[in-house]
Regions:
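Cleavable N-terminal export/targeting peptides
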Residues: 1-18, 366-369
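Outer-envelope beta-barrel architecture signal
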Residues: 15-23, 63-69, 105-107, 150-154, ...
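Outer membrane beta-barrel
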Residues: 18-30, 41-164, 186, 195-200
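Transmembrane beta-strands of outer-membrane beta-barrel pores
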Residues: 25-33, 51-53, 58-62, 73-79, ...
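Outer-membrane beta-barrel architecture
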Residues: 53-57, 98-100, 144-146, 193-195, ...
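Detector for outer-membrane/organellar transmembrane beta-barrel domains
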Residues: 151, 185-187, 195-311, 315
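Outer-membrane beta-barrel "beta-signal"
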Residues: 351-369
Length: 369
């Protein structure tokens, strides 16, 4: 979706040890259009999607501890949260909350809700992950080991669940691609990421993930419900090959993603779905920084490899511009796409067309000690 965002840091973040509190807010104007007979799913020149954001960050002084922490709480309709399937049932989302422990200068353990180390996430603000769709800007709950040695970097992570509560599936920011509170959610996800700096400011990497899918449907057997046991007869796996590079003030990111999901059997039966679902996806981002201005284009494509899915290749493009006005950023972004990727991870309705203009502004104030 699109939004007007406002960001500012009146007090610079401390480069030394300490604690930082940041108050943020954003607001958005959206002009949307699609080829459906009604406008129930579009916004016709509407202002809104406002949110208030609270950040806390900190770390121990060198030689006086190995800890660090980071948390972000969002409140409001622009929180990028899925109200029907999150942990609060409201427009309130804990986007991230983790504690870090430095093992040494090159290795760190992160515990809590943090970024899933899988490829890269887009630079745009409101169009979002587009057809990365569940494999871009994802925040899951678990433990992650990250490290770097010379030109090599790695991440190893285990996420018992994707959100805080037993039936919430809110991965914020890119929602509605990993089930729902009455269909399924992902469990016990293992992620491995290895990347190498092939030249200064140029990184090539590969990441793999695999995990279980828990059945949350009403068809789950009575015995399992009584014993409060989980029915985990679904599974998922994915791999990504990615590149991130900078050429002076220009930047380029590219990746290819292969996804597979075997849905829980009761869910597939209930919704008359093909149980095994596969897609191949591609993403490209190019941009340039020029003073206070940043120009960028995000492009994604997806193809279904699911038996019986006759939808063609779908595509999405989001050109944008961002201006750093001091306390925050002002964004102007356009999104055009055909088709979409649903909660089950497959391509739907390649004849669907959607176009949108988003104007956004954000603002931040930080206080450090």
């Amino acid at each position: 979706m699109g939004s007007l965002v406002l960001t500012t840091a009146l007090t610079p973040l401390s480069a030394q040890a300490g604690h930082t509190f940041t108050l943020g807010a954003w607001y958005n104007f959206a002009e949307e259009d699609d080829n459906l007979p009604t406008d129930a799913y579009t916004k016709n020149g509407e202002f809104g999607n406002e949110a208030v954001i609270f950040y806390v960050d900190g770390n121990a002084e060198p030689g006086h501890g190995i800890w660090s922490y980071s948390a972000e709480l969002r409140i409001g309709p622009g929180s990028f949260t899925d109200v029907d399937n999150n942990a609060t049932g409201d427009e309130i989302s804990l986007h991230k909350a983790w504690i870090g422990l430095d093992l040494n200068d090159s290795h760190k353990v992160i515990i809590g809700k943090s970024q899933v180390p899988f490829g890269w996430k887009t630079s745009n603000f409101w169009p979002g992950d587009m057809y990365q769709a569940g494999y871009g800007d994802q925040m899951d709950v678990g433990i992650k080991l990250q490290g770097r040695q010379n030109r090599f970097g790695y991440n190893l992570a285990y996420y018992p669940r994707d959100d805080w509560w037993s039936t919430s599936t809110d991965t914020t920011d890119d929602n509605r691609h990993w089930g729902s509170s009455d269909s399924y959610r992902k469990l016990n996800t293992i992620v491995a990421d290895l990347n190498m700096e092939i030249a200064p400011k140029h990184t090539l990497g590969i990441a793999l993930q695999t995990g279980e899918l828990e059945d949350l449907t009403a068809l789950r057997s009575a015995g399992l419900k009584i014993d409060n046991q989980k029915e985990r007869d679904g599974e998922q796996s994915a791999g990504v090959l990615y590149y991130k590079g900078k050429f002076g003030n220009n930047f380029v990111n590219a990746e290819a993603i292969q996804t597979y999901r075997s849905l829980p059997s009761d869910l597939a039966q209930q919704d008359a779905l093909e149980q095994d679902r596969e897609t191949r996806r591609y993403a490209l981002e190019i941009g340039r920084n020029s003073g206070n201005w940043t120009y960028y284009l995000d492009a994604t494509w997806a193809q279904s490899q699911t038996d019986g899915n006759r939808e063609g290749t779908i595509s999405a493009y989001a050109p944008g511009i961002r201006y750093d006005y001091g306390p925050g950023w002002i964004y102007a972004e356009y999104l055009t796409q055909n088709g979409y990727i649903d909660r089950y991870g497959d391509i739907v309705d390649s004849d669907y067309e959607f176009n949108a203009l988003y104007l956004s502004i954000d603002w931040y104030y930080s206080q450090s000690k």
